[in-house]
Amino acid sequence: MSRQVARLIGSLSSKARRCSTGGSEVFPSCQSLTSLTQSRSFASDPHPPAAVFVDKNTRVLCQGITGKNGTFHTEQAIEYGTKMVAGVTPKKGGTEHLGLPVFNSVAEAKADTKANASVIYVPAPFAAAAIMEGIEAELDLIVCITEGIPQHDMVRVKHALNSQSKTRLIGPNCPGIIKPGECKIGIMPGYIHKPGKIGIVSRSGTLTYEAVFQTTAVGLGQSTCVGIGGDPFNGTNFVDCLEKFFVDPQTEGIVLIGEIGGTAEEDAAALIKASGTEKPVVAFIAGLTAPPGRRMGHAGAIVSGGKGTAQDKIKSLNDAGVKVVESPAKIGSAMYELFQERGLLKQ
């Protein structure tokens, strides 16, 4: 979709927002405009919470919308059908970008558009402050794509997150979250996703895309895909996502992609074992041959003090009844075989 079309869609939705707040006298075409933008309206009617963090009713604002990355990925989100309702860039409030209203602060954007989620495309030195602003505005969800945020900044963010219960952070240093066919928040390529029955949670962005492509190829599709990021201090972990997938009726199977470093995979294995879930789980752990003490890509991908090895993680997952594959190329076929064995394939 061209930038002009993205602007048109955004402009229509912006005017529909003004209509919904009593602007029919100023905008006489509001009645017809509302019907054109019904799927992107900003109704104040409460919706049931999303099964796994996002759905078609999620209203998203973009922090850093006027930057190169913010502009490009907002266009992609609008094209995908995500309800992008606003942008936030300090000192640019009162303007429009891609047809969306731009505000000086998250609080102003939330009050005016009823946004309940944010995606952050802000440079690393300022990203933690952007996250804190979203927390202070009490958004339901913040998705931070930014890589390279100083870890001491994220320690402060983690403290703020742990001091409240309203806002959830996904990331940083992640591809984002997508519910295929409904809502895309992040940098993942939308076209490889297909609405389906597999929940995917991963510390690696590119391996997430591999799992998506394979589950699409075998006809299973995805219910929700969450990239939790590879930094040591992130907002959402495997356990948070698994708890959602276990009770989500659309999710019939789960793919977990981990890597060396930390104990997140061991914690996930303990939860899977304790839950007694009957949903098949396939896992892949990256970094089997990584030397101890050397960081492998992500800031959190490091074996230190004899902990966080791929071997330990694989053993924990195997003990929990998880099918662990030795190559990411086998994720899709392994899940399909488990569905066959358990009679879960619909004829």
Swiss-Prot record:
It is an enzyme of class 6 (ligase). Heterodimer of an alpha and a beta subunit. This is Succinate--CoA ligase [ADP-forming] subunit alpha-1, mitochondrial. SUPFAM superfamilies: NAD(P)-binding Rossmann-fold domains, Succinyl-CoA synthetase domains. Pathway: Carbohydrate metabolism; tricarboxylic acid cycle; succinate from succinyl-CoA (ligase route): step 1/1. InterPro entries: Cit_synth/succinyl-CoA_lig_AS, Citrt_syn/SCS-alpha_CS, CoA-bd, CoA_lig_alpha, NAD(P)-bd_dom_sf, SUCC_ACL_C, Succinyl-CoA_synth-like. It comes from the Eukaryota. Substrate binds at Y209. Keywords: Ligase, Mitochondrion, Nucleotide-binding, Transit peptide, Tricarboxylic acid cycle. It comes from Arabidopsis thaliana. PROSITE patterns: SUCCINYL_COA_LIG_1, SUCCINYL_COA_LIG_2.
